[in-house]
Amino acid sequence: MHTYKVTMVERQKDGSTHTLTQTAHCRDRQEVIEWYGLEQPDIVSYTIVQID
């Protein structure tokens, strides 16, 4: 398992955006993408940084 810092920008229903940063403990980057649903249309952008 690795530790990742995940920062994502979500588009809200009113068109505004919201930035959220979380820490994830996952096997790899692909698991982070799947776990947080980062390929969903409401996600404007994201960054994943491995911190361990």
What are these regions (language model features)?
Residues 9, 27, 49-52:
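A structural detector for beta-sheet-dominated domains
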Residues 16-27:
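A short, exposed loop/beta-hairpin motif centered on an aromatic-Gly-Thr core
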